[in-house]
Amino acid sequence: MHIGVPLETHSGETRVAATPETVKKLIGQGHRVTLQSGAGLLSSVPDSAYEAVGATIGDAAAAFAAELVLKVNAPDEAELAQMQSGSVLLGMLNPFDNDCIARMAARGITAFALEAAPRTSRAQSLDVLSSQANIAGYKAVLVGAHHYPRFMPMLMTAAGTVKAARVLILGAGVAGLQAIATAKRLGAVVEASDVRPAVKEQIESLGAKFVDVPLETDEERECAEGVGGYARPMPASWMARQAQAVHERALQSDIVITTALIPGRKAPTLLQEATVEQMKPGSVIV
């Protein structure tokens, strides 16, 4: 099979859909791989690294002309126009973008959105969301620590003691749990909130305090169970109580990291404008 790996053209995108290690395995299985020149440069992987494992370096047209195209993000209209009818596209294609799906269908392309893979043991190797969320949670803490004008851990000196930074993490999925672990390793005092009571043990096992918002109705308890490891939209009554709890914790926090996400929907607004205006000077929101 001819496999193509084009350069990602979305603004700010630095990832590449295949590393030299992956390409080496594909070529070892008898496939032919064409990589667009410069596709791996922003990931610190030069063309020579791909050539060393047997890949062919070509232009965009050569990469998109393959039978199987590997992409990080969904292709735009110009990129779709370069693909062959009947070819296969694999990547994070945003399955909730109906317009993009319609364009791919009209082009006769078979598309597999990896973020739609079920979160099961059998499909674990396809779980790109968890791997990327893990990185996002780690990086979010580093970004917050970089912009925070003081220190993360408690520092004791002859001149006095500086208290540890207080970090509030909203959402305790893969990204949130990694953010908790990273913030704790940097010495911060961490609190975390999530709609799912089941994650309380996971939060506390990492050394953070769980911001508990009690569930008062059957509807709230049902929504809090989630589906496939993901949260569901919560009733307005619970959201109001949660907003008050977040407001109180945010005013005491130095860094707030928001990771909450609902698949296929706009991320919930967990920090209100009034809360932000009252937060401590120098505090950071990621």
Predicted region positions:
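Glycine-centered, small-residue-biased loops immediately flanking beta-strands
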Residues: 283
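Glycine-rich phosphate/diphosphate-binding loop of Rossmann-like nucleotide-binding domains
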Residues: 6-45, 153-249
